[in-house]
């Protein structure tokens, strides 16, 4: 394998990093730096903050977010499989059945443990 084949990948990585880093550096170097006490104060619709902005969230919200990500990734895995269903054959079908079985068993476990209850 020739190293010249990796040159486009290296160029792509460098351009991507440049697109992300160059605007940050230019803004830092060329931007005005005028610190002011009003810029560092908390702002809440033109008034001073009435209370601390940090609120405690229930852990169940995080659980719902994690479950959403889990099942969203499930769809991300199933979509390419569905497109290539004819090519993967019986072995691919069996692998997806095992994958779905593991997900369903995990979902039933969470359900039985009461992790999805809001009471």
Swiss-Prot record:
Tell me yes or no: is Translocase among this UniProt entry's keywords: yes
| N-terminal signal peptide | none
One Gene Ontology CC term in the entry: plasma membrane
E.C. code? 7.1.1.-
Bilayer-spanning residue ranges: 9-29, 63-83, 88-108
**Chief subcellular location:** membrane
- One term of GO molecular function: quinone binding
Give the matching Pfam families. Oxidored_q4 (PF00507)
Q: Which domain of life is it from?
A: Bacteria
List the catalysed reactions. a quinone + NADH + 5 H(+)(in) = a quinol + NAD(+) + 4 H(+)(out)
Q: Which UniProt keywords apply?
A: Cell inner membrane, Cell membrane, Membrane, NAD, Quinone, Translocase, Transmembrane, Transmembrane helix, Transport, Ubiquinone
Per UniProt, what is the membrane topology? Multi-pass membrane protein
Q: Which InterPro entries does the record cross-reference, listed alphabetically? A: NAD(P)H_OxRDtase_bac/plastid, NADH_UbQ/plastoQ_OxRdtase_su3, NDAH_ubi_oxred_su3_sf
Q: What does this protein do?
A: NDH-1 shuttles electrons from NADH, via FMN and iron-sulfur (Fe-S) centers, to quinones in the respiratory chain. The immediate electron acceptor for the enzyme in this species is believed to be ubiquinone. Couples the redox reaction to proton translocation (for every two electrons transferred, four hydrogen ions are translocated across the cytoplasmic membrane), and thus conserves the redox energy in a proton gradient.
Q: Subunit comment for this entry?
A: NDH-1 is composed of 14 different subunits. Subunits NuoA, H, J, K, L, M, N constitute the membrane sector of the complex.
**PANTHER family (alphabetical):** NADH-UBIQUINONE OXIDOREDUCTASE CHAIN 3
Question: Which protein are we looking at?
Answer: NADH-quinone oxidoreductase subunit A
Q: Which organism is this protein's natural source?
A: Delftia acidovorans (strain DSM 14801 / SPH-1)
């Amino acid at each position: 394998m020739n190293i010249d084949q990796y040159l486009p990948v290296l160029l792509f990585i460098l351009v991507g990093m440049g697109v992300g880093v160059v605007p940050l550096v230019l803004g830092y170097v060329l931007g005005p730096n005028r610190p002011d006490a009003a810029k560092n104060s908390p702002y809440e619709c033109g008034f001073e903050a009435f209370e601390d902005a940090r609120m405690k969230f229930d852990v169940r919200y995080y659980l719902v977010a994690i479950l959403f990500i889990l099942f969203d990734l499930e769809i991300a895995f199933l979509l390419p499989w569905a497109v290539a269903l004819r090519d993967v054959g019986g072995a691919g079908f069996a692998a997806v059945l095992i994958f779905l079985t593991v997900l369903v068993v995990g979902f039933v476990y969470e359900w039985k443990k009461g992790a999805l209850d809001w009471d």
